[in-house]
Each structure stands twice: as C-alpha cells, then as structure tokens.
Amino acid sequence: MEYPKIYLALDNCFALKRWVEPETWLPIKDLGYTSIQASYDNEFDMLYNTKEYIDSWLERLTVAEKQYGAKVQSFYSGYQTYRTSGLAHPDRRVVNSIVEGWIKPAVKIAGERNADMGFALHGIPENIMQDPEKYRECHEKLYRIYSDIGEYARKNGQVHVCVEAMYSPHHTPWTIEGTKEFLKNIYSLDGNAIYTTVD
C-alpha cells in the first residue's frame, strides 16, 4: 500500500488574521514550517479585491516563497460560511455568482500554483431544513454543484477541493457518516472527487 504524502502545514489564521502580506508571514519557516495554508479571507478575496491586487499579491507570494524556502500548499476560506447560504441558496443566480465569481477564479489560482484549496461555502436555509423533501432536494443540488466543481478543478490543475466538515445540520456534512455519504454521493454522479477537511 502506498501512503499519501502528508504535510504539517501552518494556517496563517493562527496569527489572528493580522498577517496579510506574504513577506510578513513566510518567515514562519524559522519555526520549522515549510508548508503553509493561506487564507483567501485574509489575503485576497475574489469578490472584494481587484484582479490587479490579486495578481500583485500572488507575484509577491512567489518572490517570498523563493526567498524563504517555504510554500503555500493550499488556500482556504471559512468566513463565507457565515455570510451567505452560498451554494445552498435557493436562487440559482446566487449560486452561479459564487461559482463563477469566487470558486472558479480560486481554482484557477490554486491550479497555477500547484496548490490545493478548500472552503465551507454552503449553509442550508431554515425553511428548507424544516422540510425533509426540500432538504433532500437541496442535497441533490449540492451534489451536482460539487461534482461540477470537482470536474472544473480536475481540468484546471488537478486541484484537490476540500469541503470543510462543519458542526450543525445546516452546514453539511456534519457527522462522520454524513461526510462519507456526502463524498460518495458527489463522486457517484460523474467520478469527480471532492475531499473533506476536519478542523
């Protein structure tokens, strides 16, 4: 059996989200960390920053990685979870906006940098939670959305996309068994893998 390569990475959120420039946090290598998980939320958000800023930030990251001998292995976002129903929103226009305006650009960036990515970008609305049939339908939609994201990630740099396992029924998956089902149901559609993160 071949085991996967595992990195002990430091998520730069440990610094209370105050290190927003690569030059200021890549010296963390002095503590022995060479793998870093950068936060889309802290450094650059596709919905709130300009393309010029994001491009500049990524150029600075490349220079800092070479200077300090450390690498961003993955990018992550969590704060969107608390802002919107996101990918579980009942209006497809909201879902499309997040996929086209946030997820696809994030995948492209991760793919170009040979990094992986993850997020928690769906919260099921309360009225759907209270209706078992609507709850099931919402999950079916999520499986399709995530399968499509998995395909896009595969075609744009073989990016591993992780969905953070959360802690309440509106942020599925939230149990071990539910996580297994979530991942299996996504993969069963078209063979596009989505992974999970346990925080």
Label the predicted regions.
Residues 1-115, 147, 188-197:
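N-terminal pre-domain/capping segments
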Residues 67, 83-196:
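Active-site acidic/histidine proton-transfer and metal-coordination neighborhood
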